[in-house]
């Protein structure tokens, strides 16, 4: 890990705490915009439901967010980084193959959540305008929300370095506003504090006819807990844990303040109190304060959306490095480490968000679609966390009850959320299934490809390569010929590479270079190793890169060459006499292989589906040369047929007459 990055997120400081407010808590911090509104819906306000609901909210924030994520899961860091893929990279060391399943399901569910969070947060905030303009059409609200989304996704290409400076003070104002508004209402009806007693939650769940299914809406208060873990690398465990004390306090005050207001108006409905989009979040505000409250809420919702978008970019980047996702173009708009921009994902998210807004129109309708995907992610995190605790040799008498309790809690939330399937939950589930399918196909195809890749010992061909280099009867193909190789062992090489050099068209070069990229299970590391196979003839370079590092092979390779020349380990000047005496450096040529599925295959039905789907997706993804950051003018693409199962007997008969 780079020192600069390590220092960035490891220190506890006032600045670090403020940055944490601006980055980490957008999702969970904007939940008061819609949680109590979702719990009540169109029903008449009932004290039992309000007290039971707010008790469930308090204990969900305590058990799920505080204990599971802030205290336990944040301890499972991968060199300071968090998130479900970082956790998978840790437990991958156990060599348990099936752990890939919860990793893919969890990552896909988290990405699906990124499509619903911006629309519901921004819509909930913007709908507050109706407090001043009750007759405002729903379509007008929809257009405003889409406009905000368009601006938000458009500025992603410029990075968040500039606007990011305002995130922290803005979220500080937001949380201070939440706490103050809630506290004022509690002072009017202090009895609401009794809802801290878990009896009220139990009473709601066990006695009230629809009590259990209220959990589906209660869960919305903790959907942002996974983001606390995913963004740990930006702020650090200590900063998150300390700042959470302040954040949870303001959230609890606001939730209880909304509950106090509602109990005071028992017997009414939200629609009677605030019109079509009656929302207790805005109802507890003094009328004169509403303009300021709406603006602050909208800005907080935008910041929450920004955090989800940035998190999605990071997640896709990690998925690519772990071979879960096809290669896509990545840009680095600023020099801030870890900040990246993925154009294709950015606009897919945008159109997904717009689709959600157009389909559901109102935040109240979106509440039914929200929660199902993220609870799946949380369950998958719990499964992976279990193996992390085993890996850390945590005592069974502590680990087994802990994991069992959380699986029971989370499966209860899952069952409650499934009831919302027909009313909107199907949307995020369909998106999650689509993402799971892409990741599974890509991973299995890569695995099949690896299993059928033939490797040879490079020593068996060292002599012939050296002879080819000296064979003046063959035209020189390049001074330096560079091949990318997937062979993990330094003394091995794919058979197709040797075939390309010796048989497809003999390629004479002064020096042959074989470059291998090894993705590490830790996030930030850039190392390389040089293996001399034959002095001034054959070399292998192994790059060891963290799973969050950009793969800029062209720049890295040239840096390695400069270092080798400086050390006197290689002579890269042209061997043409006229050029050599003037110290002219020879040219470099990269040769990349592009596979296609051969017709000479007798694949099993499932392999046929996987491989055809893989090559279809591959056509839409980034080319190898762009993925490795190579200059297209110095790259040669060669196509190779991919034969996995050649037919054993094609039934051909020779005729002698």
From Swiss-Prot:
Q: Which GO terms describe its molecular function?
A: potassium ion transmembrane transporter activity; symporter activity
The catalytic activity, as recorded, is: K(+)(in) + H(+)(in) = K(+)(out) + H(+)(out)
State where the protein is found.
Cell inner membrane
Keyword Magnesium listed? The answer is no
Ordered alphabetically, the record's keywords are: Cell inner membrane, Cell membrane, Ion transport, Membrane, Potassium, Potassium transport, Symport, Transmembrane, Transmembrane helix, Transport
Recorded GO cellular component terms are: plasma membrane
Is Lipoprotein among this UniProt entry's keywords?
A: no
Residue ranges annotated as transmembrane are: 14-34, 47-67, 96-116, 140-160, 166-186, 201-221, 242-262, 283-303, 340-360, 371-391, 396-416, 425-445
Query: Looking at the Swiss-Prot or TrEMBL record, what is one Pfam family this protein matches?
Result: K_trans_C
Membrane topology type: Multi-pass membrane protein
Q: Identify the domain of life.
A: Bacteria
Protein's job: Transport of potassium into the cell. Likely operates as a K(+):H(+) symporter.
Task: Give the similarity note.
Answer: Belongs to the HAK/KUP transporter (TC 2.A.72) family.
Identify this protein by name.
Probable potassium transport system protein Kup
Q: Which gene underlies this protein?
A: kup
């Amino acid at each position: 890990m780079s020192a600069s990055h390590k220092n960035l997120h490891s220190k506890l400081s006032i600045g670090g705490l403020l940055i944490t407010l601006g980055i980490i808590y957008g999702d969970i911090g904007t939940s008061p915009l819609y949680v109590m509104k979702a719990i009540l819906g169109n029903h008449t306000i009932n004290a039992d439901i309000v007290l039971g609901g707010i008790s469930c909210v308090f204990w969900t924030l305590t058990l799920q967010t505080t204990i599971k994520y802030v205290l336990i899961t944040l301890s499972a860091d991968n060199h300071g980084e968090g998130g479900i893929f970082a956790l998978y990279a840790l437990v991958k060391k156990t060599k348990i193959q099936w752990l890939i399943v919860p990793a893919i399901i969890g990552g896909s569910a988290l990405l699906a959540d990124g499509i619903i969070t911006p629309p519901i947060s921004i819509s909930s905030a913007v709908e507050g305008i109706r407090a001043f303009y009750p007759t405002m059409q729903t379509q007008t609200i929809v257009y405003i929300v889409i406009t905000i989304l368009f601006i938000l996704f458009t500025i992603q290409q410029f990075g968040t370095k500039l606007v990011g400076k305002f995130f922290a003070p803005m979220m500080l104002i937001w949380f201070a506003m939440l706490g103050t508004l809630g506290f004022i209402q509690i002072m009017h009806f202090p009895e609401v504090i009794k809802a801290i007693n878990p009896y009220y939650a139990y009473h709601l769940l066990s006695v009230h006819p629809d009590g259990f299914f209220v959990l589906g809406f209660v869960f919305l208060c903790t959907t942002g807990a996974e983001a606390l873990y995913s963004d740990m690398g930006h702020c650090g465990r200590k900063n998150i844990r300390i700042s959470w004390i302040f954040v949870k306090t303001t959230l609890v005050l606001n939730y209880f303040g909304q509950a106090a207001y509602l109990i005071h108006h028992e017997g009414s409905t939200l629609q009677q109190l605030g019109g079509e989009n009656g929302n207790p979040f805005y109802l507890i505000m003094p009328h004169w304060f509403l303009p300021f409250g709406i603006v602050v809420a909208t800005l907080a919702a935008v910041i929450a959306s920004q955090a989800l978008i940035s998190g999605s970019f990071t997640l896709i980047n990690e998925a690519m490095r772990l071979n879960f996702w096809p290669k896509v173009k990545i840009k680095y708009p600023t020099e801030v480490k870890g900040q990246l921009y993925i154009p294709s994902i950015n606009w897919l998210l945008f159109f997904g968000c717009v689709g959600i807004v157009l389909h559901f129109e109102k935040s109240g309708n979106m509440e039914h679609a929200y929660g199902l995907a993220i609870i799946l992610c949380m369950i998958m995190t719990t499964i992976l966390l279990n193996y992390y605790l085993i890996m850390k040799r945590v005592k069974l008498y502590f680990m087994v009850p802990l994991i069992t309790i959380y699986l029971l809690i989370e499966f209860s939330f899952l069952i409650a959320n499934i009831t919302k399937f027909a009313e909107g939950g199907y949307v995020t589930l369909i998106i999650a299934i689509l993402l799971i399918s892409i990741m599974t196909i890509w991973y299995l195809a890569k695995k099949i490809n690896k299993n059928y890749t033939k490797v040879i010992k490079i020593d068996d061909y060292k002599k012939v390569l050296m002879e080819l280099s000296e064979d003046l009867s063959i035209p020189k193909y390049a001074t330096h010929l560079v091949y990318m190789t997937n062979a993990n062992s330094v003394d091995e090489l794919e058979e197709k590479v040797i075939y390309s050099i010796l048989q497809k068209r003999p390629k004479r070069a002064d020096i042959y270079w074989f470059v291998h990229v090894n993705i590490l299970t830790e996030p930030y590391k850039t190392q390389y190793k040089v293996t001399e196979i034959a002095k001034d003839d054959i070399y292998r370079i192994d790059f060891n890169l963290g799973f969050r590092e950009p793969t800029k092979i062209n720049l890295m390779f040239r840096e390695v060459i400069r270092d080798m020349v400086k050390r006197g380990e290689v002579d890269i000047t042209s061997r043409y006499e006229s050029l050599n005496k003037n110290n002219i450096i020879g040219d470099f040529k990269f040769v990349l292989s592009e596979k296609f599925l051969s017709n000479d295959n007798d694949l099993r039905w499932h392999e046929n589906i996987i491989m055809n789907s893989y090559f279809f997706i591959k056509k839409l993804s980034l080319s190898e040369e762009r993925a490795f950051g190579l200059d297209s003018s110095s790259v040669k693409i060669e196509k190779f047929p991919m034969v996995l199962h050649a037919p054993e007997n094609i039934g051909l008969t020779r005729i002698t007459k």
